[in-house]
């Protein structure tokens, strides 16, 4: 049944907003608002809706790539040719249709070959070389203009500072981290009470920062998957200068094909994936995909599909590109692996903003190479929509290869012992009555933001995170400890910049069944004369450094609901001072670029609460500069 025009317009507007928000989170904030499957479904629905309407705005996400570069943080880099995305297919039938359509460009009797490559779950990077020297590295950005990350990429060991290729040459590729390296860093981070959510976000955070960590950057790898040049032989964004071999450096004759070009790049010390394969027919492509699927866990880094490209550069040029993706390449996305386990219980957690989220306690089971024992259930509506009962057998998968997700219950396996879950009416931490923040909200929240210790611990952990005030050792366990610090009662957040080494040494608390005193040296000591660990000094030093953080990071540290890095930077750029933001009226906040009504009201209301104003004033009196 067709949509009325008004409904279709509203649906397109909503889908566009959701996709742009997801892109901002993914490309600028190094996080994910949804799984790859959910994102792909939104893009597919938007294309269908625009097709039904018979019109696409030229700025629609269906026709654009990535998100605009954050030029207030990074210098702009204009790509020689657009750094495009890829169209996706989700079944072998869809891939075969693309294959048949694409190979029609090959003349009768001329063999049409394809290159198959792993689709690595990393961050797209463009490297520019001038007469053999690396002169810049850039992110994708919006496809036309990226962010200059040269200083960070110089630390990546697999990226050569010089290559034996003349002229101005751009190498397109993927920056990523191998699983064992990521696990090693997370183990070290665990010892420092800091861990990273997933490999892709780790890489994005490392290369998109103004304060690079050399050790982290040295753990990153890079594989080339394309190239482009200012002049010479052009092929739909993957170019090759016809005089390259005549210029010396490498003797191998290069043909105008992707696969042979990769060999040439490899000889020039540019890393190329050894899993790349040349296929002469669809049967070979299908066999390659099946072999990778069966041996996926043997691949030492996260992948989420296979990229299939036509090999001939000349034929790539003939096929060309849309504004978003080349016509000569496509990404086949792996279906998420799933398995069945038992839903042992449903429990709830309280977040730093008071949101109460149910999660599934599962019978532990191996899935995609790791043990899964928990999965988020989002809210009571999701539990009802999926018809979940405690005791059910459920099918689970890892959304985007990372986050465990409960897909559905298996009601045919029920024996009558299953129990209906009901959301609690009281906060499991402080006992406050749970309620929606406004009429019609699905989520329940604990309104006791000032005194709920779990919320306080969550806010402290967030304040200490790398993207906010970056306070060493202020992660989950120590945030929990500080929230229970007797000296400050329930005001550890307010008194954060007063914390001393003596306060840390005095910390002794029970955490997950174990007595902990993380800032006190082990061994002989007299009561009242315990020696602090080096980590205690590091934490106090980083608290002192945090006082000089930019205004936008302090806005994040205030834990204002709906405020992320992009909106915090927009507020800081527009108003320039914390005083101006505190005193701003809603209509003034609405003038800020990219701020909608929900965020404007949230910011306005936050500063109307007396204890929050006290928080800001106390931090300022304790030396926090708020960007000044």
UniProtKB/Swiss-Prot annotation:
**GO molecular function terms listed in the Swiss-Prot or TrEMBL record:** DNA ligase (NAD+) activity; metal ion binding
Record: active site? 119
Q: Which UniProt keywords are listed? A: DNA damage, DNA repair, DNA replication, Ligase, Magnesium, Manganese, Metal-binding, NAD, Zinc
What EC number(s) are associated with this protein in UniProt?
6.5.1.2
Query: What are the GO BP annotations of this UniProt entry?
Result: DNA repair; DNA replication
Cofactors, names only = Mg(2+); Mn(2+)
Where, by residue number, does NAD(+) bind?
Answer: 36-40, 85-86, 117, 140, 174, 309, 333
Cellular component, GO annotation: cytosol
Q: Which reaction does it catalyse?
A: NAD(+) + (deoxyribonucleotide)n-3'-hydroxyl + 5'-phospho-(deoxyribonucleotide)m = (deoxyribonucleotide)n+m + AMP + beta-nicotinamide D-nucleotide
Which InterPro entries does this chain map to?
A: DisA/LigA_HHH, DNA_ligase, DNA_ligase_AS, DNA_ligase_CS, DNAligase_adenylation, DNAligase_N, NA-bd_OB-fold, NAD_DNA_ligase_OB
Entry-linked HAMAP family: DNA_ligase_A
PANTHER family hit by this protein:
CHROMOSOME TRANSMISSION FIDELITY FACTOR 18 (PTHR23389), DNA LIGASE (PTHR23389:SF9)
Q: What does this protein do?
A: DNA ligase that catalyzes the formation of phosphodiester linkages between 5'-phosphoryl and 3'-hydroxyl groups in double-stranded DNA using NAD as a coenzyme and as the energy source for the reaction. It is essential for DNA replication and repair of damaged DNA.
User: Family assignment?
Assistant: Belongs to the NAD-dependent DNA ligase family. LigA subfamily.
Stated name of the protein: DNA ligase
Q: Which gene encodes it?
A: ligA
């Amino acid at each position: 049944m067709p949509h009325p025009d008004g409904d279709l317009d509203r649906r397109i507007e909503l889908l566009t907003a959701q996709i742009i928000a997801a892109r901002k989170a993914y490309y600028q904030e190094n996080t994910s608002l949804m799984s790859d499957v959910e994102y792909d479904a939104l893009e597919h629905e938007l294309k269908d809706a625009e097709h039904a309407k018979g019109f696409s705005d030229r700025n629609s996400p269906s026709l654009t790539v990535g998100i605009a570069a954050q030029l207030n943080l990074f210098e702009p880099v204009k790509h020689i040719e657009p750094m495009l995305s890829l169209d996706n297919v989700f079944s072998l039938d869809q891939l075969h249709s693309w294959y048949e359509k694409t190979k029609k460009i090959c003349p009768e009797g001329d063999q049409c070959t394809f290159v198959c490559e792993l689709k690595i779950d990393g961050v797209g990077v463009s490297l520019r070389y001038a007469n053999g020297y690396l002169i810049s590295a850039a992110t994708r950005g919006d496809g036309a203009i990226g962010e200059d990350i040269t200083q960070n990429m110089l630390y990546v060991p697999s990226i050569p500072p010089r290559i034996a290729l003349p002229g101005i040459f751009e190498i397109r590729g993927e920056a990523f981290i191998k699983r064992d390296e990521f696990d090693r860093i997370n183990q070290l981070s665990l010892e420092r009470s800091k861990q990273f959510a997933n490999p892709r976000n780790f890489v994005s955070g490392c290369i998109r920062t103004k304060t690079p960590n050399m050790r982290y950057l040295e753990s990153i790898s890079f594989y080339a998957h394309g190239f482009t040049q200012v002049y010479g032989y052009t092929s739909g964004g993957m170019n090759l200068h016809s005089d390259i071999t005549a210029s010396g450096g490498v003797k191998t004759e290069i043909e105008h094909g992707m696969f042979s070009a990769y060999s040439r790049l490899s000889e020039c010390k540019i890393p190329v994936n050894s899993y790349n394969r040349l296929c002469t027919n669809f049967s070979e492509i299908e066999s390659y995909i099946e072999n990778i699927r069966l041996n996926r866990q043997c691949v030492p880094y996260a992948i989420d599909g296979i990229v299939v490209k036509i090999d001939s550069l000349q034929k790539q040029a003939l096929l060309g590109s849309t504004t978003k993706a080349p016509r000569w390449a496509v990404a086949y996305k792996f279906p998420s692996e799933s398995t069945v386990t038992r839903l042992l219980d449903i429990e709830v957690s309280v977040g730093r903003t008071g949101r109460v989220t149910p999660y599934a306690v599962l019978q532990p089971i191996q899935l995609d190479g790791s043990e899964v024992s928990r999965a988020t259930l989002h809210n009571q509506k999701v539990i009802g929509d999926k018809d979940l009962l405690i005791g059910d057998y459920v099918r689970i998968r890892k959304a985007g290869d990372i986050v465990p997700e409960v897909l559905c219950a298996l009601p045919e396996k029920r024996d009558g012992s299953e129990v209906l879950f009901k959301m609690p009416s009281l906060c499991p931490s402080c006992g406050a009555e749970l309620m929606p923040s406004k009429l019609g909200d699905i989520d329940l929240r604990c309104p006791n933001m000032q005194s709920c210790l779990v919320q306080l611990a969550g806010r402290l952990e967030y304040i200490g995170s790398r993207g906010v005030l970056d306070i060493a050792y202020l992660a989950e366990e120590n945030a929990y400890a500080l929230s229970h610090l007797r000296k400050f009662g329930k005001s550890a957040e307010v008194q954060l910049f007063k914390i001393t080494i003596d306060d840390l040494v005095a910390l002794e608390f029970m955490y997950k069944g174990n007595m902990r005193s993380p800032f006190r040296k082990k061994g002989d000591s007299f009561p009242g004369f315990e020696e602090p660990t080096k980590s205690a000094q590091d934490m106090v030093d980083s608290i002192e450094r945090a006082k000089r953080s930019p205004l936008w990071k302090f806005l994040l540290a205030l834990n204002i609901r709906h405020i992320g890095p992009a909106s915090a930077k927009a507020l800081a750029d527009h108003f320039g001072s914390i005083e101006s933001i505190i005193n701003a009226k809603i209509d003034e906040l609405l003038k800020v670029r990219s701020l909608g009504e929900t965020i404007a009201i949230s910011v306005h209301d936050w500063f109307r609460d007396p204890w929050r104003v006290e928080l800001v004033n106390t931090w300022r009196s304790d030396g926090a500069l708020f960007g000044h």
